[in-house]
Regions:
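Short acidic-glycine-tyrosine-enriched beta hairpin
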Residues: 49-64
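An amphipathic alpha-helical interaction segment
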Residues: 97-163
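A generic beta-sheet turn/junction motif
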Residues: 31, 47-49, 74-76
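Generic protein-terminus/edge-of-domain signal
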Residues: 1-43, 52
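Terminal helix-turn-helix DNA-binding modules in bacterial transcription factors
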Residues: 168-173, 178-180, 187, 191-210
C-alpha cells in the first residue's frame, strides 16, 4: 500500500487492502495526508517520533510527508484514505491514533472505488464531503501512542526495556544504566517524550499486551 507518489485528483481517494500476519511495509511517506483504519486485525505503525498500536475500529492519522513503516501483527483488513492537504484548512495537524466512529467507517466503505472524476452535486460528492467533515473532528487516543526518545542513549534503552517488559523497571534502573541521577532521567525523559517515565512505560506495556 505504499503509494508514495499518489496525489489525489479529487480531495479524497480510498483504498481497501488485506494484510497477512508478519507482513511489513518499510519506511516511506506520502505527498498527501493519510488515514489508516483497521477494520479487523492489529498493526503497529512506527514513525521517527514514536510507535502507534492500531487495533479494530481505530485508526492513525498521518500528516503529509510523515515517514512511517507498518508491521502486521495479526491478519488485518484496512481502509486507507488519502487526503489532499489543501482540501480543508482545519484537518488534524499532527500524526496520532484516533477513534473511528461507525459513521466514518461506513462512509469510507461506501467511498471505496469512487471514480476520481465524479461530478459535483452527486451522491459520490456528498459522501466525500461528509467524510471530510468527519475528519475535522477525529478524537485522539493518546494512550495508544508511545513517543520515541530523541537522544541515542535513550533510544538504545527503549530496545532493552522492550525486550524485558516484565521487569519492574524504575527510574533508578535507568539512572544506573546511564550513570546519571534519577532527577536528571526524569527531567530528560519528560523533555523528550512529553510523558513521565512511568506513564511512558505503562503505554509501552499496553501496546505489547494488545
Amino acid at each position: 500500500m505504499y503509494f508514495q507518489s499518489l496525489q489525489p485528483q479529487q480531495p479524497l481517494s480510498i483504498v481497501e487492502k488485506q494484510y497477512e500476519t508478519g507482513m511489513c511495509e518499510p519506511l516511506h511517506s506520502h505527498v498527501c495526508h493519510q488515514l489508516i483504519i483497521v477494520k479487523h486485525g492489529f498493526i503497529r505503525v512506527t514513525t521517527p517520533t514514536g510507535q502507534f498500536a492500531i487495533t479494530q475500529n481505530r485508526g492513525i492519522w498521518l500528516t503529509k510527508g510523515t515517514e512511517h513503516s507498518l508491521t502486521i501483527l495479526k491478519n488485518t483488513q484496512v481502509l486507507s484514505a488519502f487526503v489532499e492537504p489543501l482540501t480543508r484548512a482545519d484537518l488534524p495537524n499532527r500524526s496520532q491514533v484516533v477513534a473511528i466512529s461507525e459513521l466514518l467507517q461506513a462512509l469510507l466503505g461506501s467511498a471505496v472505488g469512487i471514480d476520481s472524476h465524479y461530478q459535483t452535486n452527486t451522491r459520490e460528492a456528498w459522501i466525500v464531503e461528509l467524510i471530510l467533515d468527519e475528519l475535522r473532528c477525529l478524537t485522539p487516543l493518546a494512550e495508544f501512542e508511545v513517543p520515541q526518545p530523541t537522544l541515542p542513549e535513550y533510544q538504545a534503552l527503549l530496545e532493552k526495556i522492550s525486550e524485558r517488559l516484565s521487569h519492574p523497571w524504575a527510574l533508578a534502573d535507568i539512572a544506573n544504566l546511564l550513570n546519571i541521577s534519577e532527577r536528571t532521567v526524569s527531567r530528560q525523559f519528560t523533555q523528550q517524550t512529553g510523558l513521565s517515565f512511568i506513564e511512558w512505560l505503562r503505554r509501552l506495556r499496553l501496546q505489547h499486551s494488545l
